[in-house]
């Protein structure tokens, strides 16, 4: 037998991996032709693609007949805030309040920036939430905003507001390593589109927040990012540093990304308010691509209103993002919620839900809203995750084929290196069939929101986390209470004392129809006011 020749036994082994079975005659018939397929694949692999090269196929969450609203505008509360004397109170204040203080000259952008830089210096060792702190740049940008303020010039609600940026976004001449060892010392030549938009709005860059390596989990080349409410556990990810820094009062707000839970999961863990916009609403130009048909960008804040304010700045079409969609954004924080139809899936509040989850239904009923039990079509939603694995493995094919993935810190079974390797055995035929299943999921989600305005539920119970990410629907996640839980971990070697418990946040996810973020924001505002717990802070910061 010639070395390298495909044999019948090779095909039999492959059948086991793919979960299929051929006859002896079928195996013999395909044996020689398989070698041509292998040669073709190897030839293609000689072509190396930069991470910013997109796919030819283009995901669009809109089904035929979709009508885009043409409403646009931003109206937030016009409260007058008095600047407190405590640096901690200033640090944990909302973006809206801080913006008012700067505009009315109760505080300078430089002073606000210095407060955060001091807190980063004090608490970074505990939280490990920043990959890179841009001290000189932050102070220079703050001083520039103060000069404008002195001349009564304001660039808008983010004028002089310091923020953290997930280390997936290119920043000119500032290391952007994607949390991964192979990309350390990577210096982009230009800024990502979102950086340009935030700078034009007057926001001040404090630094690059830590990201789980290649946008997964909370483990990166600098260690593990921690949850401010329990420093023994990770912050979850992959927007690990963005959620941790925001929850810990180490920035006014932060920018995160989500492919499958990377805004909502750390927001759940750290008690922040995270907004995952509709797919295509926010430009990803200059952001690391993990999954072209799934990646989304959104704000992580300490209040609902702030997320809407920031989305109004970063929203907008960008011709440099092949998947970008022209979509106006309208947000009036004073808009009434009386006519909202709120849906819930009963099974999501069943045996796997916490008592706090179930109590939320009573609280929503007390708001006087139309609460309806609904059902999502019975489809194999979890199967869609193989689309994510295939796209992610394609994004970082070179790491797998060169064995550089061995240099990544996290090497457990569920970590990227193993997932990338396994993905090489996914069937292209199954991948196409998954794309067809995805279309059915899009239709199921569209049908769901024909009858309701918003859907509520625990983010980690039921099919909605997967279904909504693959359909492109928006989600707001906010804190609704606290639980007493032992330390949570995904590290198999880590030993945990199950008897030692900590007060940690519990959140709720609020999903909406495509491009209708205003409805979930207004509902979130009403719920936030009813619960009155948004101002509670982690004890480590006192």
What are these regions (language model features)?
Residues 106, 111-117, 143-147, 332, ...:
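Acyltransferase
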């Amino acid at each position: 037998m010639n070395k390298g020749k495909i044999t019948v036994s090779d095909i039999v082994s492959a059948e086991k991996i793919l979960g299929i079975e051929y006859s002896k005659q079928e195996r013999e018939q395909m044996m020689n032709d398989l070698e041509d397929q292998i040669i073709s694949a190897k030839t293609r692999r000689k072509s190396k693609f930069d991470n910013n090269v997109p796919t030819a196929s283009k995901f669009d969450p809109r089904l035929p007949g979709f009508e885009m609203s043409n409403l646009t505008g931003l109206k937030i509360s016009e409260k007058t805030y008095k600047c407190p004397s405590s640096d901690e109170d200033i640090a944990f204040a909302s973006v809206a309040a801080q913006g008012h203080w700067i505009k009315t000259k109760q505080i300078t952008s430089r002073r606000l920036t210095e407060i955060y830089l001091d807190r980063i210096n004090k608490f970074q060792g505990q939280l490990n939430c920043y990959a890179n702190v841009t001290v000189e740049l932050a102070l220079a940008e703050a001083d520039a905003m103060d000069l404008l303020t002195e001349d009564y010039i304001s660039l808008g609600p983010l004028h002089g507001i310091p923020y953290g940026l997930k280390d997936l976004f290119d920043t000119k001449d500032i290391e952007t390593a994607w949390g991964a060892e192979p990309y350390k010392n990577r210096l982009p030549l230009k800024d990502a589109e979102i950086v340009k938009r935030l700078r034009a709005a007057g926001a001040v860059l404090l630094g690059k927040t830590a990201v789980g390596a290649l946008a997964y989990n909370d483990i990166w080349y600098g260690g593990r990012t921690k949850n401010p409410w329990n420093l023994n556990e990770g912050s979850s990810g992959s927007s690990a540093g963005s959620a941790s820094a925001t929850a810990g009062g180490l920035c006014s707000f932060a920018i995160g990304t989500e492919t499958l839970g990377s805004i909502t999961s750390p927001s759940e863990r750290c008690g922040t308010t995270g907004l995952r916009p509709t797919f295509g609403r926010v430009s990803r130009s200059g952001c690391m691509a993990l999954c072209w048909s799934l990646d989304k960008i959104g704000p992580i804040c300490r209040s609902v209103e702030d997320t809407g304010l920031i989305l109004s700045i970063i929203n907008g079409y960008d011709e440099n993002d092949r998947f970008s969609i022209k979509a106006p954004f309208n947000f009036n924080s004073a808009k009434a919620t009386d006519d909202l139809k709120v849906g819930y899936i009963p099974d999501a509040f069943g045996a796997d839900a916490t008592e706090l989850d179930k109590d939320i239904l009573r609280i929503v009923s007390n708001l006087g809203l139309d609460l309806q039990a609904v059902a999502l079509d019975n489809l194999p939603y979890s199967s869609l995750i193989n689309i994510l694995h295939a796209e992610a493995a394609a994004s970082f094919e070179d790491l797998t084929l060169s064995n550089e993935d061995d240099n990544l810190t996290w090497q457990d079974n569920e970590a990227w290196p193993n997932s990338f390797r396994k993905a090489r055995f996914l069937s292209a035929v199954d991948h196409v069939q998954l794309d067809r299943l995805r279309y059915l999921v899009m239709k199921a989600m569209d049908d769901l929101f024909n009858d309701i305005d918003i859907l509520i539920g625990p983010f980690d119970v039921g099919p909605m986390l997967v279904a909504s990410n693959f359909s492109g629907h928006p989600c707001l996640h906010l804190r609704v209470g606290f639980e007493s839980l032992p330390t949570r971990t995904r590290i198999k070697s880590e030993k945990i004392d199950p008897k030692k418990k900590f007060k940690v946040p519990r959140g709720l996810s609020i999903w909406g129809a495509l491009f209708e973020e205003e409805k979930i924001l207004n509902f979130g505002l009403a719920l936030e006011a009813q619960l009155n717990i948004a101002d509670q802070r982690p004890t480590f910061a006192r």
